[in-house]
């Protein structure tokens, strides 16, 4: 079967990360954004910086979040698609990006958690009734952000954040671990 229909990548190219970054920079200052915009920006920045699946992003919990001046670290204890016996808990790191606060996932997340959603939090959903966010909801939000940025969502889905962010990082010489 492998030789009859060998696996192929979904995309032969990826979207330009600069288009999305320019769009996300325009959503600043955070204090003037509607909750839905802030939610979309936070989700997009966390997805870009972490390059994680939407399932992993939906498993992030402020109960297992440690934030310092240098960044935010999440410990993911949930069973994920990539989980296997003997493997330790997944750590998701969001380093601070003081060079450009408009694109800093760490500071955007902290503002979202501490300033905008503290009073309504049962989860990080942006519309009533504020319920737990599923991986499908996160993937849909990421697709909405791509669409708003002018990226063709008939080709690219929320999962494309993983490939686009890592491709951009490699092209800039950022080490991936």
Range-by-range predicted roles:
Residues 1-177:
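Extended, non-catalytic subsegments within catalytic or DNA/protein-binding/adaptor domains
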């Amino acid at each position: 079967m492998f030789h009859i229909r060998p696996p192929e990548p979904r995309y032969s190219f990826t979207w330009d990360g600069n288009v999305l970054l320019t769009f996300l920079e325009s959503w600043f200052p955070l204090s003037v954004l509607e909750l839905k915009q802030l939610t979309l920006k936070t989700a997009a920045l966390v997805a870009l910086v972490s390059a994680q699946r939407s399932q992993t992003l939906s498993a992030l919990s402020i109960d297992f979040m440690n934030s310092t001046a240098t960044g935010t670290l999440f410990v993911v204890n949930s069973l994920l698609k990539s989980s296997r016996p003997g493997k330790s808990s997944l750590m998701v790191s969001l380093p601070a990006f003081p060079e450009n606060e408009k694109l800093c996932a760490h500071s955007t997340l902290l503002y979202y958690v501490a300033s905008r959603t503290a009073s309504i939090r049962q989860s990080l959903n942006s519309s009533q009734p504020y319920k737990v966010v599923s991986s499908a909801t996160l993937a849909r939000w990421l697709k909405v952000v791509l669409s708003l940025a002018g990226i063709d969502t008939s080709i690219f889905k929320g999962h494309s954040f993983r490939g686009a962010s890592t491709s951009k990082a490699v092209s800039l010489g950022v080490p991936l671990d």
